[in-house]
Amino acid sequence: MADRQDAERSGAGPARQSVPVASLVAEFLQEHGVDRVFGLQGGHIQPIWDQLARRGVRIVDVRDEGSAVHMAHAHTELTGQTAVAMVTAGPGVTNTVTAVANASVSRIPLLVIGGCPPIPQSNMGPLQDIPHTAILEPITRLARTLRSADQVLREFDEAWARASGDRGEPGPVYLEIPTDVLRRDVPPALQMREHLRAKPKRRPQPHPDDVAAVADLIRAAEKPAIISGRGARTTDGTDLVRLLDASGAAYLDTQESRGLVPDSHPAAVGSARSAVMRDTDLLITVGRQLDYQLGMGSPAVFPHAKVVRIADTASELIDNRRGEVEILAEPGAALAAIADALKDHTPDTSWRDELKAKHRKRAEDYRQALHSTENGADGHIHPNRIFGALDALDGDVLDLGETIMIADGGDLLSFGRLGITKARRYLDAGAFGCLGVATPFAIGAALAYPDRPVVAVTGDGAFGITATEIDTAVRHDAKIVVIVSNNRAWNIERYDQAENYGLVVGTDLADSDYAGVARAFGAHGERVTDPAELEGAIRRALANAPALVDVVTTQDAASPDSGKGLGFVPDYQALTPWNDAEVARRQEGI
């Protein structure tokens, strides 16, 4: 009898006549390839939680709901498969807001399932009742309460399509189902099971006239450049490399597209970024917004450039700087078509070759600095030495090319973007600048790819935001290594206060023992105060993951972004040199 009740509860077995909504939701997720869900349990979502567990879906239970969304974010970004976070009503939902906003700005497809009080209790002051959808609607592609049991599969099908960008910009979606609806049975005739089937994403093709126009612009350009973003990840990089070869363009990636083009390629000139942006006469963006990280595409930052935009969503096509040609199509298809149109073109690569020489020299100079930067005046380790130690271990206990690297923090993120050069898969918070992603991103990465090393380097301030997720890593055996640059400060802001205001206030942190925190949660933890100890500590951490290395670093180290005024927040641009150029452009226009 008990076995039969279990079968009916799960919606499985030949005895089934009707299926509870929670079972339909679980079946939908499985049909769409979901084999794990990140979440924090609560009574409002227990019916789905139970169904997923009974079906063998792995539940990754976390310590904070925002971390569940961060883990889902990392899973989606690394695997390309839409991931799921599940949280209970009220504070469970509100705790996700920052992480959902981060995924929204990063255009990451994911599904957040929230709890919702039962319909009979509506407007009566029920437990954890708050207008979830009104809160989340501005930062999601869809936020909806599902009240009709027989429409749930249709609603999930639509939400999944919206998350993937099938009807616009990709990003997070939010669905909630009142608990009483989750328990309702739906008869077979009303289940709408045709919505269970996962559907392939559409691949819009470029118009031949647009392809020809871009090819003509490339032929006429002397200094073409291509900048890629997250939208370029619809391809494996093959078509992008083909176009770089056919066009002779210089290439800049962003944190969104790291690894699509190997650093060894003649076009890869990331260390000469400023020169590319200043001198290019044809800028081609591929799946990349022209946001603050690219000077908003301003003529002050790209003074000589005609612009071509290629993307499969309008948000990466028409923001800030319109293109001479704008191609709304699947980026891989557009790149391949343009490369084909240039098959008889012999590009002049002299400008690119000069940039490559500069790139190699600067990259090597910086690599040497990673190994030799002196301690600060306070006697503590320079953050560069963390990345130098990782570089020294490359080819020994690490293959940095196969290592999933994560950077988090203010100053530390700036150091990390320069110090992490070999990893083909790299994550950071992206354009939203959300701190606290390192540990949850690392857990999501390690569970998705348990056979690959996962190393997260984070500032101490950023680490503290989600430090309790070390417990999650231990419980779920996520083999992560977290390296904390412990300079006892919110240092990018501290630098701004000292330089621009002359008063340091509210930016100093305690000299906390983060290795001790890790050990308290059951992870391996070591503290390092001498740069000579770094390699050994990281080696032991890799062998005993999950692990944390607490590196006592200097406050004297100002990151490149600090030096360029990122913490100051200039009036017109994110960085002072760009802001100065913008001011000059506006004065010339007066």
UniProtKB/Swiss-Prot annotation:
One annotated GO biological process: isoleucine biosynthetic process
GO cellular component, one term: acetolactate synthase complex
Annotated SUPFAM superfamilies: DHS-like NAD/FAD-binding domain, Thiamin diphosphate-binding fold (THDP-binding)
Lineage: Bacteria, Bacillati, Actinomycetota, Actinomycetes, Pseudonocardiales
Region of interest (C-terminal lid), ranges: 566-590
Reactions this protein catalyses: 2-hydroxyisobutanoyl-CoA = formyl-CoA + acetone
Domain of life: Bacteria
Protein name in UniProt: 2-hydroxyacyl-CoA lyase
Annotated cofactor note: Binds 1 thiamine diphosphate per dimer.
Assembly information from the UniProt record: A homotetramer formed by a dimer of dimers; active sites are located in the dimer interface.
